[in-house]
């Protein structure tokens, strides 16, 4: 028997340009026996590691993005530990220049995580996550395809320090992982050409972190605030000063 089967779908009106109110399908999946099939928030995202914010997207170093996936999750050690792994449709955002062209991707992204939770209601946790990517591109000069290796790691969590204060955090580092850092999504910086030799491309190293706190004034009233930052680093001179 399949046991409990969940069929879920949700949508909003943020699918077009800002202020356009274009309908958008966010999630649509079937979940059973630890398997999730369909479209959901990426497995690399720790949904409980960011505070409630006025900004819909959350902190700029967070990663609240959606992907089409096959995911498996399992809890063990009296539900203190949870492991998850997925194959997700890749979303490549790169700067190709004149010597390379985009193409259909052949290999899915592979995000995974291991989480430890504690407390009577398991309301505090820390999580280690990783992702491996293999984006493909077409090399014009040789009329052939080539690929690069992208990867990322993340530490995240939320800690209930006491009844009136909760801490949120995440830190991420990797190469070519713009879909997994909120404000870099769609930036064209997964990989870029070498300004001195446009026939070469390289994955760009990037990192970000955020930390925030929530103060519960009453059971129904709270305030939250935090700090978040991110950066794309140079890699052997790749990407120019004005980017």
Give residue ranges: language-model regions.
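C-terminal/domain-terminus segments
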Residues: 6, 93-96, 100, 104, ...
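A short secondary-structure junction signal
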Residues: 48-49, 84, 94-100, 138-142
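Detector for outer-membrane/organellar transmembrane beta-barrel domains
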Residues: 121-242
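Outer membrane beta-barrel
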Residues: 1-93, 106-107, 111, 115-119, ...
